[in-house]
Amino acid sequence: LAVILDYAVSNGLCEDSVVYRDLFDTKIMGLITPRPSNVIGKFNSLYEKSPKCATDFYYKLSQDSNYIRRYRIKNDLKWITKTEYGDIDITINLSKPEKDPKAIAAALKMKSASYPKCLLCKENEGYAGRVNHPARQNHRIIPMVLGGDDFYLQYSPYVYYNEHCIVFNSEHTPMKIDRSAFEKLLDFIELFPHYFIGSNADLP
């Protein structure tokens, strides 16, 4: 993929910056990543064997499609600090690309956009991206029902810890901690007993 990117840059097909290279290589990977329906079908089929088989497949796909950029993740800094309260895992995430000056200038000239509404909305799946919103043509999400509501599972592209996944509502709604939130967390554990799950505090 790096060779293709270098060729694209040298032949004027892509600007030479992290943002534009990411947009370009994600478009390429989107063409060879299996369709969402195929990914969901394979996931569900493997889930019948075991939930872990299903998530193993999905996590590997998320890496092989370059949605999770392994070559960047390996640069993250991680260590354990001993404290009087116990060991604390500390991570410094270096895999999230920094904006370059060209991309910042281009973003300032763009009309404001509200699609997708945020980086987690289901509409990100397959989204072509722009200089101020990452491309997601290689992104696939897994539907599930929690507490009677439609949710999706995805892995974080920035991997703060092993198999770092995110569960999000099918609708763009504020996060809320209440009884139903705990019911949904427990539903998730029943579906994926090899994982643990938590929830952020109430956030807008």
Model feature map: region roles:
Residues S170-Y195:
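Helical scaffold of the NTase/Pol beta-like nucleotidyltransferase catalytic core
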Residues L146, L203-P204:
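A broadly tuned preference for mixed-charge, low-complexity surface segments
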Residues L119-E125, E183-L185, G198-S199:
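Short C-terminal domain-edge/linker segments immediately following a structured domain
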Residues L1-P174:
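Active-site microenvironments that recognize anionic phosphate/pyrophosphate groups
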